[in-house]
Each structure stands twice: as C-alpha cells, then as structure tokens.
Regions:
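Conserved acid/base catalytic micro-environments in cytosolic active-site loops
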Residues: 2-174
Length: 174
C-alpha cells in the first residue's frame, strides 16, 4: 500500500491544534495500519486517531503493535485529552470515541452492546469539531462503517481517503 504522508508544505494549525486524521479499520486491519504508519515521518505536524472494531472480551494490544511501526508517540486515548501533533491515539477497548474542542471524549459501550459504528461516530464528531482541519481514512473492512463519517468530513471541508483492495487501480483522494 503506497501512502503519501509528508506534504511539501506545513499543514495549518487551527486553534493551536494540529491537523487531525481519523483512521478507521476493521479488526483485521492491523497489517494495513502497520503499513500506513511505516510511511509517516516522526516529525509530522499531524495527530492520528485510530478507531477500530475491537472485541470487548479480548484485551487489545494495538497500541503496542503500532509502537513498533512508527517513531511517533503512540498511546491509548484518555477522556478529555487534548490532541497533540506527532501522536497516534488508539481507541480504548470497551468504548467509543468522539471529539469536542480538540479534546478526545470516551464514551463507554453499554454492556452487551456489540453492534455500533465507531468509525462513523468518530468521523462525524471529528468533522463537526474540526471542519477543514480533519481527514478521514478508511482501511480494510466490508461492513460499511466509516462510509457515513467520510461523507460528513467531506461536507465539512475535510479530506477523505479509502484503502483500495489489492489488484484495483488506486483512487485519488476526494
């Protein structure tokens, strides 16, 4: 997977916040995430928020996996944490993420809840909060989660990307 992650110009800061990229992936998207972050320079003036479909009954090691794939700081998102450049935030298990005024908000899943669209929920909140200071990237998965969220990001002036299945011609960002 070829990904261009280093623009030839500095990205604008909005309200002292870096450009924020939401990345949505299915539970099987570890390889795609690993490849993505191998191409991101450590000094990137970007913050990344990774939203995945996690099994609430199994402990996630995604933050540890990504730490070995990038020189950027990687950490599990905490409630109220202000997003900062050069950091990869990973959605914690048993919750879903939103964002308000550049601060991550954790919302716990109700017990027994399995069916939700965490990527759409985060992307929609990101678009409303950051407008054109946001991008959405959908990696792997066929359940449609992320489809509505990227529409909202695009409507608010942000940029959207989607992974192309192997063997298909690459698409330009919209």
């Amino acid at each position: 997977m070829d990904i261009l992650c280093s623009p030839p110009y500095p990205l604008p800061m909005k309200n002292d916040l870096p450009f924020i990229v939401g990345i949505g992936a299915s539970a099987g998207g570890i390889d795609a995430l690993s490849q993505f972050f191998k191409g991101v320079p450590a000094q990137a003036d970007i913050a990344f928020v990774v939203v995945t479909h996690l099994n609430p009954d199994r402990e996630s090691q995604l933050d540890k996996v990504l730490e070995h794939k990038t020189e950027m700081a990687v950490r599990v998102a905490t409630d109220g944490e202000r997003v900062s450049a050069g950091t990869v935030y990973v959605m914690p298990q048993g919750s879903f993420l939103s964002i308000s005024s550049g601060r991550l908000k954790l919302n716990e899943l109700s017990p027994g809840t399995r069916e939700h669209q965490p990527v759409d929920l985060f992307f929609s909140a990101l678009a409303e909060d950051q407008k054109d200071n946001a991008a959405g990237v959908v990696l792997s998965g066929g359940d449609g989660d992320g489809t509505l969220g990227v529409k909202v990001i695009k409507e608010q002036g942000g940029v959207t990307f989607a992974q192309v299945a192997d063997g298909e011609p690459p698409l330009n960002p919209e």
